[in-house]
């Protein structure tokens, strides 16, 4: 009997720490026995709500970072498009100036030749005042030269207008390409935004 009592005491002493641990994890006093069950459930629910709150805050932070990145991407895309448009406008201006200078020089050269022909005709006319045949020949040559000069001016004008038309066509094609690239970039951005929106919206727990 004494041995049995001793073992019983050892068992009681061995269970004592376990009871202390249980009481530490479940600090319920006798006063808590009369506590409202809803308050007890509320206490156990608070840590879960805190975890869900932290999880929701982390998702919102990530979404905010994604939105900032998307805004930076849009700004960079529009900046690149503006640079391309400015470069296109500068190139157009340079090409137009080059065409104007080219045909301006040709016009000046042609009119200078025309003036020289008129001056030569006047000189020949003065020399051939007393020679009717020479005068007729000089007149014929002058008319032929003037006709050729006018024809050359007409051809140059047509070439000038054709050059301007080709320049406008090329500029339109380049603008169309820039617009196409911008639309393509916006389409990619829209798909990426929808993908990330669906991804993070599915991460939230259902309200049901």
UniProtKB/Swiss-Prot annotation:
The record lists the organism as Mus musculus (Mouse)
Would I find Coiled coil among this entry's keywords? Answer: yes
Question: What name goes with this protein?
Answer: X-linked lymphocyte-regulated protein PM1
Q: Which family does it belong to?
A: Belongs to the XLR/SYCP3 family.
**Expressing tissues:** Expressed in lymphoid cells.
Chain segments annotated as coiled-coil in the UniProt record: 122-143
A Pfam family matched by this chain, by name? Cor1
Regions of biased composition (Basic and acidic residues) lie at 22-33
Residue segments, region Disordered: 1-43
The record's gene field reads Xlr
* UniProtKB keywords: Coiled coil
């Amino acid at each position: 009997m004494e041995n049995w009592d001793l073992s019983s005491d050892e068992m009681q002493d061995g269970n004592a720490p376990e009871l202390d641990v249980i009481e530490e994890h479940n600090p319920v006093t006798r006063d808590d026995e009369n506590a409202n069950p809803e308050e007890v459930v509320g206490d156990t629910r608070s840590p879960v709500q805190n975890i869900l709150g932290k999880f929701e805050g982390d998702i919102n932070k990530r979404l905010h970072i994604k939105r900032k990145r998307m805004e930076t991407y849009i700004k960079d895309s529009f900046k690149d498009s503006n640079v391309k448009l400015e470069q296109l406008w500068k190139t157009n201006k340079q090409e137009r100036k080059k065409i104007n200078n080219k045909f301006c020089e040709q016009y000046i050269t042609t009119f200078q030749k025309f003036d020289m022909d008129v001056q030569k005709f006047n000189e020949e006319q003065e020399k051939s005042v007393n020679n009717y045949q020479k005068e007729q020949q000089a007149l014929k040559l002058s008319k032929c030269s003037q006709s050729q000069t006018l024809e050359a001016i007409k051809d140059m004008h047509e070439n000038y207008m054709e050059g301007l038309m080709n320049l406008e066509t090329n500029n339109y094609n380049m603008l169309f390409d820039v617009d196409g690239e911008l639309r393509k970039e916006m389409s990619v951005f829209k798909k990426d935004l929808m993908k990330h929106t669906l991804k993070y919206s599915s991460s939230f727990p259902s309200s049901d």
